[in-house]
Amino acid sequence: MTEKLQPLRGMKDLLPDDYKVHDYIINTARDVGVLYGYKQMSTPIVEYTKVFNRSMGESSDIISKEIYSFLDKSNDFVALRPEFTACIIRSLISNRLQHKLPLKFFSTGPVFRYDRPQAGRQRQFHQLNYEYIGAKGAITDADTLKLAVDILKALEIEQDTTLELNSLGCNESRSVYQQKLVEYLNDFKDQLSKESKIRLSKNPMRILDSKSETDQKIIANAPVLSEYYTDESKEYFEELIQYLDILGVKYSINPCLVRGLDYYCHTAFEFTTKKLGSQSTILAGGRYDGLAKIMGNNDDVPAIGFAAGIERIALIREYNISEVKPVFVLPIGKNNICYALEIVDKLRTENIAIIIESLGKIAKRMQRIFNENAQFIIFIGDEEQANNNLKIKDLKKEEEYIVDFAKALELLKK
């Protein structure tokens, strides 16, 4: 028996109804981004693995467990992109765009992570991605956060989300804090989860967002990052809060919201929802001023960005999206097909969506048309062809018209 072929586990086909929703989400988000000056760009789905090794660090969960990396036929290690930010910064450097800063980029497309598939978490999924590169300061962060809010508002899900906000401080703040955190956690080393024991030596700040109940009890009394802010870090965060209040952006400060990599600084944020169970984050981002230099640029480049999961957005709200319903042209006999093709071509040049139904018996063709919930059918038989006119049936109004092409056009464009 021939094996029934299926997509890979955790990867799904996007059928027309799914694609319609994805398209709506992308177009809506793109339109909001345009109002903020963002321009769309794309990068290859496949990059050298070292692009992500540099950006995420080999000890990160994505690199150590989730990345799709393999040796290609040129004996190079390449990877399916697990996120956009590293690709965008790689593009900035390889295309020598530094002299054009600041730049605002919007990207969208599939990303890949080898994870345990579940609702809202697949191995291939799609993201909206925004990067504001070359601009520093709390005003830039506030503008980016307001963009995220406006996108969620345009998608009618803002009311279902909470903005969780934190400041990672400057490098000096974080360095002192990390030392104090490790000192504290070392006293509980034997009680930490297996995952957190590994992180303690490689990426201790990531322990703060552990989901383990045991870890959570230990973290509850851990030192708080804000206690180690320098004056600069305090002023930066206070300024951001002031701007968000002016803009009317609601937020909740979460001191455990962190980014475990050294190039992140100051603002970190997530928009979460209670509608998706454990997969509660639908949009997340932060400031990453140190990434460009790590990836080979001569200097640091200030930058902030975020990504949102399209599949998760689609799970929060059911979108009823209207679409253009095509007009169906039904030639009665084979001898009417040539005339029908002429009519179809003329109507399409007038931007009218047309499907010609010429296969099978009339009854079966009519059934297919009814299944499409069409409004108009154009019947073309010998009489219509001889008189150079069209018989149009309006299925919603249950009316029938025999008209010339000009009148038909007027009727179909109403």
Curated annotation (Swiss-Prot):
Catalytic reactions of this protein: tRNA(His) + L-histidine + ATP = L-histidyl-tRNA(His) + AMP + diphosphate + H(+)
SUPFAM superfamilies listed in its UniProt record: Class II aaRS ABD-related, Class II aaRS and biotin synthetases
PROSITE patterns: AA_TRNA_LIGASE_II
Stored Gene3D superfamilies: Anticodon-binding domain, Bira Bifunctional Protein, Domain 2
Any Gene Ontology CC annotation: cytoplasm
Annotated GO MF terms: ATP binding; histidine-tRNA ligase activity
InterPro entries: aa-tRNA-synth_II, aa-tRNA-synth_II/BPL/LPL, Anticodon-bd, Anticodon-bd_dom_sf, His-tRNA-ligase, HisRS-like_core, HisRS/HisZ, HisRS_anticodon
Similarity-based family: Belongs to the class-II aminoacyl-tRNA synthetase family.
Name of the protein this chain belongs to: Histidine--tRNA ligase
Taxonomic source organism: Rickettsia peacockii (strain Rustic)
